[in-house]
Amino acid sequence: LLRGNDAARILINGKPSRLVGINSSFIKELPADAIEKVEVITSPSARYEAEGSGGIINIILRKSKKLGLNGSLSANIGEPKSSSISSNINYRNGKINFFNSSSLYDRIRPGSSSGITEYFNGSEPSTFFSEDRIRERVSNGYFINNGFEWYIDDNTSLLGSFFYNNYGSDNLESNTIRELDSNSNILNTITQNDFEDDIDNNREYNLNFEKKLDDKGELITIDLQYENSKEWENSLIDENGVASESVDENIQSESFFIRSDYVLPIGENRQFEAGIRIESEDDITDYKVFDNVGNILVEDLDQSNIFQYKERISAAYTQYGVKVEDKYSFLLGLRVENTLKNVNQLTIQDYTEINDTGLFPTFNFGLEITEEETLTFGYNRRIRRPWSRFVNPFPTKISPILIWQGNPYLDPTYSNNIDFGYIKRYKSSFTINTSAYFQKSTNSINTIIEETGEYAEINGVNVPIVVRTPINLSTNERFGFELNLSYRKGRNWNINTNFNLFQNKVEGTYNDIVYDNENVSWSFRLNNKLTLPGKIDWQTRMNIRGPNETAVSKSDGDFSIDLAFSKELFKEKATLTLNIKDLLDQRGWRNETFNENFYNDYEFRWGQRSA
């Protein structure tokens, strides 16, 4: 979340990547020493793609440029089982630099969840069901990032890289479903086990060309990227020891990206920029369901489907910046993006095409009051496009009584964003960075829950089946205040805090149900690094998230603390580190969902304390 908004766009080396989209575990498995820096951009200029109404998070992967042969090696071991080894190597001789980052990991991630659902039966007594899930994800994999930089001359360079990621996991989830009476006495029990195998691999090829046209900063760059990904997942579900269902899901993805930017300084205080960008994506999902018929798993053609999703984004931008009296700075830009989508259900020959064009103006202003004090203002228009899972209309069974179904007619969400910022730096190494922001979004995408009118029989009891589906429900207004404080005392103490307070207002109606709601929430982060006697570094990370509420749900807040101790050895050529994640063993999430037909109370644990 960025400022309480889950619509931030994550980039790898300034470009979109399937590594983030398909295999969300990639970010979690990426070792810290493979990352050079992380850029957070809350008011992007027209140079950046318009995707991401919550801003941009850009992860820059490390590539050392030191002369000669250089390298580092890192090994980790932890409990619950967690082991990894990673390396960073580069060799530079004259005009050519070769670099490599690699990592190999093997770990277990336990988790659990529990919930109770009450179904209202009019004048009849309510029906109660509880669910208790225990899961264990055993994952292993590796990634390799190889590349080169060729400095052809003082003004020309060529960078090429190849990234390969291989991920596999074996997941076991045990779900105990109990029918209860109004006094919570158990009437019936059924146990479901879900055995899931998951294999993902991704190949990414990158090429970057940069040419300085003069010594005043005139520059042209060209970026090319090609990716192909494959994901295979098999899930076998048994009930009370008897196989009841099997699901095979194969996803093949291919994407291509090209971008070119031109920068032209005009005098000492003006600059003109322009660029183009084309991005394409082609995903095919083969989803097959097998049911137990006479103790034989037979494909259910009514629940199986082949789904194709194609997307092409064509964009162009221009922006002009000027600095006046070394005090005022202005950056004005305009970006246009055309999106062409094809949503195809190949099994039933159902095709949908969506063509959308949007204009995205940006304006950024800066006032340098003194060398230590700055005021900023930013405006931008952004877009959030629904991704492939949200537009796939074919139902996917989550549990016997819960279905997910996408919506092929979803429109993108457009947002207008305003940001006021103030930065004050003190000579005592104390910095205040604060901002007030406002965002208004139209056609906001929300997930609703409805009854399908169908029932599932569980231990002889007919239980209503509900479906979760995304719709363009509402207009959303978000107003917030953010305060960042940082203090550095030499090399021995460094502390950073972030406090975010925001109000969210939603207005929307669907099927005569009013979803209007106003909610105030907040978050707090602290990162404190202190050098103890013996040159032992002690780092504390604290995260607090306030409660949240919508018209049909409530979620509790979350609190966690991570600790780390490190000591440099062998004349600072090696480092020994101890990490403790979730010190109090309470990181999790609790949510209540309610409507006229049922009430659900659900609690989820992300994992457990680890070291």
Regions from the language model: what does each represent?
Residues 230, 296, 340-342, 371-417, ...:
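Surface-exposed extracellular loop regions of Gram-negative outer-membrane beta-barrel proteins
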Residues 305-312, 354, 383-433, 440, ...:
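Outer-membrane beta-barrel signature, preferentially recognizing the C-terminal barrel domain
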Residues 81-112, 125-172, 197, 201-203, ...:
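Transmembrane beta-barrel wall of Gram-negative outer-membrane proteins
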Residues 1-19:
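Extracytoplasmic beta-strand/coil segments of soluble accessory domains associated
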Residues 246, 255-259, 301-305, 407, ...:
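Outer membrane beta-barrel strand-and-loop segments of large Gram-negative receptors
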Residues 567-611:
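C-terminal beta-signal and adjacent terminal beta-strands/loops
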Residues 23-26, 52-73, 85:
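N-terminal periplasmic accessory domains that precede
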Residues 15-42:
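Short acidic/polar hinge/loop motifs at secondary-structure boundaries
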